[in-house]
Amino acid sequence: MRLALAQINPLVGDLSGNAALLLAACRTAHTQGAELVVAPELALWGYPPRDLLLRPALRRRQVEALDQLAAELPSGLALLLGVSEAAPDRQQPDLFNAAALVQSGGWRVVARKRLLPSYDVFDERRYFRPGDQPGLLELEHGGRCWRLGINICEDLWVEEELHGQRLRGGDPVGELQALRPDLLLNLSASPFAQGKAQLRRRLAAAAAARLGCPVVYVNQVGGNDELVFDGGSFVMAASGAVCLQLAWAEPDLQVWDAALAPAGTTSPLPDPEELLLRTLVLGLRDYARKCGFRRALLGLSGGIDSALVAVLAAAALGPGNVQALLMPSPWSSAGSIEDSLALAQRLGIATGTVPIAALMAGFDAALNEPLAGAPAGLTAENLQSRIRGTLLMALANQQGQLLLSTGNKSELAVGYCTLYGDMNGGLAVIGDLYKTSVFRLCAWIDSPAAAACRQALGLAAEGELVGRAIREKPPSAELRPDQRDSDSLPDYDQLDPLLKALIEEQRSPEELIATGTDAALAERVQGLLRRAEFKRRQAAPLLKVSNRAFGSGWRMPIAAAG
């Protein structure tokens, strides 16, 4: 049996458009001799559809799309894809997350998802009931009955010693052992997080060893709001060797012959910084495209955060579709302006300049009487940021551009950002990257190791992009004379590990103090994190690249202790 792995990039809620994607993939697979096409979880809906699943009209549209696929599928070809299935009663939730087999003339549900993730960004128990039977499909082909084990995404995540935690009960992989499948097909929609590609392989290898058969893992690709799906679908032999590896961060379709003895190939994972870069580019490109934007705008300060966002935007949308605005104040250094213009020239993006000194003076004059004097201190600093935010929003509004916020995760965590100022934007591209991660990624981008990746992304392959001057400059908001971030915050090399422990590892200040962290520092950082919650509630959506981001999976109260 020849299987095609269809790694598609769906648009959430576009059931007819996604059906067309699947049909095109099936026709291509048919020309390559495939007999079964395997598509991702909820392939017709796009993952995650969230409350779109509750709309009766869209449920009817899914049935119409499945009927259309059955009518137009090439003869002799079958399609296995993820669908939602209506439960036989009205008890809520009234859906199953399921897999359906489509063949010429009809379709039927053949498996239901057993383990429903309801943690972090996942909320499947809001919509779905769990299945209660292992998924096994028998297909006759070439005089042989193929026994195909089927599970859906989370059903594979059952190895506690690999996953690091037991998030739910049940063992769908173990329950298939007695059924002796010839193959295990896993339909996935697994979003990117740093280090996750290796974990997927380890989980698949564990399942292949337990079942004594190959694992076919088909993942979604593309950006859907904050989640970016990195693809990387694969076939793994029972030995744990990778037999087939699909592309990372782009759609792909490849055919594998299950009747041949699985031969492992050398298929190393991409460099972590390369995969992070390509994932961020994909997330930005798809967010813009799926929201109807062709062009983007950002403020360019001469600092490393806005420089990285400019690189990502040029790669995602093309240099000709990116505009950078310089908004120097009396406190902006000549070096920052020069560095910004040099960066824009290296990237080939357009620039504009609007000095803000006159606008600052206008605000000072307007506020002089009610404040009994000119704004000072933090008020004056925030006014500069809000002036810049207003200018950027005006240009983006007038010119139909997507405004990109350039703040990083460290700033969002401790509130070192200004509401209605530098937080303005439609997407916080690097809002899940700590400052130290920004420095590390920019250093990799400027290294010879990134040349091939840069060329593939449409960027100059030779020379520096971000530039040494920007990479080595001490971080500064330049809102007052001789300002440095370290005037207000601990050094990022000290701050970021603390933030990661508090956010991703959910450790308490007391635990950190017990392991040697300075008590005053731990309490201070925890206090900053807690008090900044009201700002994060109003922040632009970001691209999630860590195990815990300030997005839909971060559900902290604003008015709270702890």
Residue ranges with predicted function:
Residues 1-299, 312-316, 326, 351:
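Enzyme catalytic cores with a strong preference for nitrogen-chemistry domains
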Residues 146, 212-213, 238, 264-302, ...:
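ATP/NTP-dependent adenylation/nucleotidyl-transfer catalytic domains that generate, transfer
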